[in-house]
Regions:
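Extracytoplasmic/periplasmic/luminal assembly and interaction segments
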Residues: 41, 50-101
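Short helix-adjacent coil turns
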Residues: 43-48, 138
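Hydrophobic membrane-insertion alpha-helices, especially the h-region
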Residues: 5-25
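Non-cytosolic head/periplasmic domains of membrane-anchored proteins
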Residues: 87-173
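Hydrophobic/aromatic side-chain positions at a characteristic register within alpha-helices
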Residues: 22, 29, 34, 41-42, ...
Length: 173
């Protein structure tokens, strides 16, 4: 019985130790991605800050990868990745700031075009916000096209579909 208790205890300690190592490595990667994204954000490179990607570094004379806020969220996407560090929530806030406060309508549409075939969980929100910005700029034809595109591209997402349909109905009144 004593051997069973020691074995179970050892397995539990081993699991906690390995999980802690993996968590810490994810945390360190997240901090790096967050810092890189923040530098891009501060330079006005909102697409790069949001998604990350390869870009040319003139000093190094080569393409380098720069992380984005989305990589921070991806690192902690698994429901078992707990506890989520504060950098996760900061990245969420920065993503919302980019989508709702920083992007112009044309930048939002350009981001959609750039990342449409690439995994990006924020494209539906970007597209809806882009349509709203076109309305603010009195570019109603573009707004209508964007909302219809949102329905066509993300029609299975009920929230996005309903929002786009609502905006189209308001435009057609």
């Amino acid at each position: 019985m004593k051997k069973v208790i020691i074995t179970v205890f050892s397995v539990i300690i081993g699991f906690i130790f390995i999980y802690s190592l993996v968590w810490f490595e994810s945390y360190q990667n997240s901090l790096g991605f967050y810092d890189q994204a923040t530098e891009s954000f501060e330079n006005g490179e909102f697409g790069l800050a949001l998604k990350g990607g390869d870009h040319y570094d003139a000093e190094l004379r080569e393409y380098v990868y720069t992380g984005g806020y989305e990589q921070v969220l991806v690192a902690w996407a698994n429901k078992w990745a707990i506890p989520k560090p504060s950098v996760y929530y900061k990245a969420e806030e920065k993503i919302n700031e980019i989508i709702y406060d920083k992007l112009t309508a044309d930048e939002g549409f350009a981001l959609f075009q750039q990342y449409f075939r690439v995994s990006n969980r924020h494209l539906p929100e970007i597209l809806i916000q882009t349509g709203k910005l076109y309305i603010e700029n009195e570019q109603y034809g573009k707004a209508e096209a964007v909302f219809q595109l949102a329905i066509d591209a993300f029609g299975r997402n009920e929230t996005i579909r309903v929002e786009a349909q609502t905006q189209l109905e308001l435009l057609n009144q």
